[in-house]
């Protein structure tokens, strides 16, 4: 009788361990996808905005790219045109990603952008949606950094 109980307890413990491990797998896989998406967007952003490597940056886009920035057309060519115009107008443009968040297929960046080295710059929130590891949609909002503020917290 004791052997049967011990065997039953061992079997129950093994089943509980297997169930816990199986339950952790999807969450771990989701974390992996989120982290991979974040790495993709950060690599894209560095290629596009800091190194001005438009061809390398374009490789991060999916086959259909939806742009919500009113200054840019949809598609890789719309992005390419916008970036070329920005770099021509602001050759000293520099972007410093302060925070990066991933939630499912979305990656959000909080960025300090300086169009000219001597200026205070802009606080920008960039939102990207990815499918199968490729950027397929983009939104952004911009706010100039003021000379003075009502608080001492800073924009970043």
Spans of features found by a protein language model:
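C-terminal and inter-domain tail/linker signature
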Residues: 2-156
């Amino acid at each position: 009788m004791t052997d049967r109980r011990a065997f039953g307890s061992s079997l129950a413990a093994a089943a509980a361990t297997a169930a816990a491990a199986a339950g952790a797998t999807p969450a771990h896989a989701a974390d992996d996808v989120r982290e991979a998406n974040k790495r993709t967007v950060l690599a894209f952003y560095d290629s596009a905005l800091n190194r001005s490597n438009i061809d390398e940056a374009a490789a991060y886009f999916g086959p259909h790219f939806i742009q919500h920035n009113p200054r840019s057309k949809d598609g890789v060519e719309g992005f390419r045109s916008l970036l070329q115009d920005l770099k021509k107008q602001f050759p000293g443009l520099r972007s410093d990603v302060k925070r990066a968040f991933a939630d499912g297929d979305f990656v959000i960046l909080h960025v300090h952008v300086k169009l000219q080295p001597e200026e205070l710059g802009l606080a920008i929130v960039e939102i990207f949606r990815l499918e199968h590891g490729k950027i397929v949609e983009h939104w952004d909002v911009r706010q100039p950094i003021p000379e003075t503020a009502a608080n001492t917290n800073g924009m970043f």
